A protein has these predicted regions:
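Bacterial N-terminal signal peptides that target proteins for export
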Residues: 1-10
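Gram-negative bacterial Sec-dependent N-terminal signal peptides
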Residues: 9-17
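N-terminal signal peptide c-region/cleavage motif recognized by signal peptidases
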Residues: 19-21
Length: 157
């Protein structure tokens, strides 16, 4: 009997550590998604308030767009990984991937259509930095997508 007890303890510890590591992984993805979401939402409303010139504002907005895309990618990747961990196969993650392709096309098309409204002028043609109206649109739609995914996939996140 005494020889079985010491052998059972390492086996029990192995099972417990495996179970806990799975929980930690799930929590890790949720944490990564939450950090990216919070970082992005903290920027909302105060974009480029210190920019004094049109060139400065456009450069700032482009930097903000890049930061927004980075936060979105972290958020999306963590959501995707959480879906994989929460299901027996990759079908939920693959379904999310399909919606992402459609959404990315929508984002570009919607912002291209919106910027056509500003036929002329600095809001559409601010110079070599790129159109600020389009950049603002891309930022706004990306943040909106993050909010939608967070709400829709709340049980996973």
């Amino acid at each position: 009997m005494k020889t079985r007890a010491p052998a059972a303890i390492p086996l029990l510890l192995l099972v417990l550590s495996y179970t806990m590591s799975g929980s930690a992984q799930n929590g890790k993805q949720q944490h990564i998604a939450d950090l990216a979401y919070q970082a992005e939402m903290a920027h909302e409303g105060g974009e480029c308030a210190d920019a004094l010139t049109l060139v400065d504002r456009n450069e700032c907005l482009n930097d903000m767009r890049i930061e927004t895309y980075k936060n979105y990618t972290k958020f999306f990747d963590a959501l995707r990984e959480a879906l994989i961990q929460a299901s027996p196969n990759d079908s939920n993650a693959l379904a999310l991937d399909g919606t992402e392709l459609v959404w990315e096309k929508y984002r570009v098309t919607a912002c291209d259509a919106m910027v056509r409204v500003y036929d002329m002028g600095t809001i559409k043609h601010p110079g070599p930095s790129g159109p600020s109206a389009q950049t603002r649109c891309l930022i706004q739609l990306t943040r909106s997508r993050m909010r939608d995914l967070k709400q829709l996939y709340e049980p996973t996140l």
